[in-house]
From Swiss-Prot:
InterPro entries, alphabetized: MinE (IPR005527), MinE_sf (IPR036707)
Record-given protein name: Cell division topological specificity factor
Keyword annotations of the record: Cell cycle, Cell division
Top-level taxon of origin: Bacteria
Gene3D superfamilies assigned to the protein according to its UniProt record, in alphabetical order: Cell division topological specificity factor MinE (3.30.1070.10)
Entries under NCBIfam families matching the protein: minE, PRK00296.1
Family the UniProt entry places it in: Belongs to the MinE family.
SUPFAM superfamilies, alphabetized: Cell division protein MinE topological specificity domain (SSF55229)
GO biological process terms held by the UniProt record: cell division; regulation of division septum assembly
Length: 94
């Protein structure tokens, strides 16, 4: 590093480039999080209705998560907390 290099602006680490990089990260994160399909809430309601035909279930026991892994790969993850089965093995509604 020469003497005059100290006074010249560093193009890689200028404040504008740092701000630009940070803004790109924020935009990328928001795009990733906002990719839930519009039909996801309807799908969750329908899945809950089907499950409730067979077991009594609290609506808060169903968790639905949608992830966009790559441009062409989407993952829909369902977590259902089912009630405990009685000792008789009867799974019907009480």
């Amino acid at each position: 590093m020469g003497f005059f290099d100290f006074f010249s602006p560093d193009k890689k680490n200028s404040a504008a480039n740092i701000a630009k990089d940070r803004l790109q990260i924020i935009v990328r994160e928001r795009r990733c999080c906002d990719r839930d399909p519009l039909y996801l809430s309807d799908m969750k309601r329908d899945i809950l209705a089907v499950i409730c035909k067979y077991v009594q279930l609290d609506p808060n026991a169903l968790h639905v998560q949608f992830e966009q892994k790559e441009d062409d790969v989407s993952v829909l993850e369902l977590n259902v907390i089912l009630p405990e089965v009685s000792s008789t093995g009867d799974c019907s509604k009480p």
